[in-house]
Amino acid sequence: AVQMAQTARQQGGHPQIKSLAASIITDQQAEIAQMTPIAQKLGVKPDAVPLGGQMSGGMMSDAQALGISMSQMGMSMNMSSLGTARPFDRAFIDMMIPHHQGAVRMAHAELAKGTNPQLRALARRIVTAQDREIGAMNQWRARWYGATSPAGGMPQG
């Protein structure tokens, strides 16, 4: 998400996209900062998505253990294609919504199966924030391009 948002801050055509991108970067960095010490305390090595946008082996096994596929995680896209996509804002929305949907699915899985109170609170915040962002992106896409994202809206937990 951070890589896509950094590209959107530079190439976004609508001010709403640039503003959302800045917010995503700030939120993601805060979430990573919050999760890292929790993971260390639990003895878990945090995995990151490399710049190419492919999930690491550890992230894949974590998602699969929760019953979530890579396409459900929004990680099956080729993020390197975003920089050359036209219209850029539509491509950004069409890539970010599935990514957000994947984060929401992971957050719902944490709420269903997790026991760490800090992670459960973070999961609730992720669901709330990303629901709002998915709704906004679909409204913008419908207004600017005549239809909402093919990915749909908020996944249900």
Task: Annotate each language-model stretch with its function.
Residues 1-157:
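His/Met- and acidic-residue-enriched segments that coordinate or traffic transition-metal cofactors
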